[in-house]
């Protein structure tokens, strides 16, 4: 599966949403792509997001070149099916395109 992983940049996190769940994030203005940075882009041996979560939480499984922290709540995984917010339990599909170059509306 080809994926991109985005994580909230600590320098850009003005609303203190790092590691916060989707509902909390929505109550505080929603997911703003401009607060995120790309930490991985590439292919992984996975068919499901849960496997992606396992790979990026198991040091020995992480691909070479991965420069992020372990995959956690508030991270966004983008694949051919869309953008998915890593929530407290599972993933929540984001309804809008996740574009880090675009301001939130």
Language model regions located:
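Extended boundary segments
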Residues: 1-44
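Broad hydrophobic/π-residue packing in well-ordered secondary structure
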Residues: 1-8, 49, 84, 91
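Short, compact, well-ordered microdomains
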Residues: 67-102
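Short non-domain terminal segments
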Residues: 17-22, 38, 54, 82-83, ...
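Short, conserved turn/kink motifs that form compact alpha/beta structural patches or helix kinks used as
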Residues: 29-78
């Amino acid at each position: 599966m080809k994926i991109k992983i985005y994580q909230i940049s600590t320098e850009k996190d003005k609303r203190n949403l790092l590691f916060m769940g989707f509902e909390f994030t929505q109550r505080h203005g929603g997911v703003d792509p401009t607060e995120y940075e790309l930490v991985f882009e590439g292919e992984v041996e996975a068919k499901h997001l849960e496997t992606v979560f396992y790979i990026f939480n198991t040091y020995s499984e992480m691909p070479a070149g991965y420069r992020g922290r372990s995959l956690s709540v508030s991270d966004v995984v983008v694949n051919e099916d869309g953008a998915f917010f890593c929530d407290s339990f599972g993933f929540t599909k984001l309804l809008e395109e996740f574009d880090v170059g675009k301001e939130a509306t």
